[in-house]
Swiss-Prot record:
Any Pfam family: SYY_C-terminal
Protein name: Tyrosine--tRNA ligase
Family, as annotated: Belongs to the class-I aminoacyl-tRNA synthetase family. TyrS type 2 subfamily.
Cellular location(s): Cytoplasm
Entry function: Catalyzes the attachment of tyrosine to tRNA(Tyr) in a two-step reaction: tyrosine is first activated by ATP to form Tyr-AMP and then transferred to the acceptor end of tRNA(Tyr).
Gene Ontology MF terms in the entry: ATP binding; RNA binding; tyrosine-tRNA ligase activity
Top EC class, one word: ligase
Binding site for ATP: 252
Record flagged with keyword Cytoplasm: yes
Domain S4 RNA-binding: 352-416
Gene Ontology CC terms, in alphabetical order: cytosol
Motif 'KMSKS' region positions after renumbering to this chain: 249-253
Amino acid sequence: MLEQLTSLPDWLARGVADLFPLATNNSEKDQSLLLRLSQASRSNVPLRVKLGIDPTGSEIHLGHSIIFRKLRAFQDAGHTAILIIGDFTARIGDPTGKSKTRVQLSPEEVEKNSENYLNQLGKGQSKETSLLDFETEGRLEVRRNSEWLEGFDMVQIIDLLSKSTVGQMLAKEEFANRYTSGTSIALHEFLYPLFQGYDSVAVQADVELGGVDQKFNVAMGRDMQRHFSQKPQFGLLLPILVGLDGVQKMSKSLGNTVGLAEDALSMYSKLEKVPDSQVNNYLTLLTDCEIRDLTLNARELQKFMALNVTAQFHGLSVAKIAQKDASKIVSGLKETVEDVPVLSVSNVNFPTKAFHLLSSIGLCSSSSNARRQIQGGALRIDGKKILDPNFEFVDQKDIVGKILQLGKKTFRRISN
């Protein structure tokens, strides 16, 4: 695979974890993505590059952005991005990575989440600071898979089911694990990869993007296209981003995310503390920076990465202001985060509200004083201002490791 990736242009190969199918001999040379790109260029017919998202939550974070950045790279190269909002499949829920059946969402929840996603991706914004190009004609199609799936009758569903087998479904790791452990698998969950695969048929995808955990679903799209006499798509898979803890994947449930909707100061402050072991990975997956020739020490590299990632979403001038403000926050004017006094929350009962937290850890003399300070804009967590005294910290992980600022001079690094 490495040889195939090195033959691709850098904008396409950068950060890619897997590409399939691979052309292994001359008889399969027509299965080369490079050849398909060349044909598209000569014919002036752009490739149709599919990315499906199920709006099961309300927030997009940097871990999600990796795949959207690759979709944007295809747009900038002149191809057509097909963003499929899985408003129909979201009602089933992708079983990937799940050890039990997902809770089904209502159509109203799905639609609300869909609009939140599109706004975070840059709908209505300039393309300079948006993840996707919503402006250039012909570069983006936003489709909802309810367009074709909601009208399926029983005959069509049975026909779709006939394209796969129970054995194929149990080859999917999550299904296999649940089957062997005796955990139930609802029959409707088998429909998810089939419907998701049919999406590729409906939009006539040439390429599908996905995370490395989505290979089964992307391959199902290829199978479906063959069954419906279409040329099978290429699968291009991107890695999973490690979260701010430097250990586990970035996930809202783990409290180690950076949200796209966060203000510049909050985003920069979090990124500046990414563990050294992950900084190069963040630079590779979240920026277009050429890092081979950089001669920066570890701390300088952290700041360089934080600035460049923040600039993508807020612009360079705003990112530089955030960098200066973050420097003041962590130093008062001390050198590093490690210089900020540590304050434990081990005696705080979670969940807890912001005003109660401040009085519990002794930073405010009373709950009423804490409320006044918060309402006056004195409280920041990792640079993000909190104005609601009743803002709730559900668990220690919501605050441990972060910098709490109260007023202009009080800074504490929260520990458990």
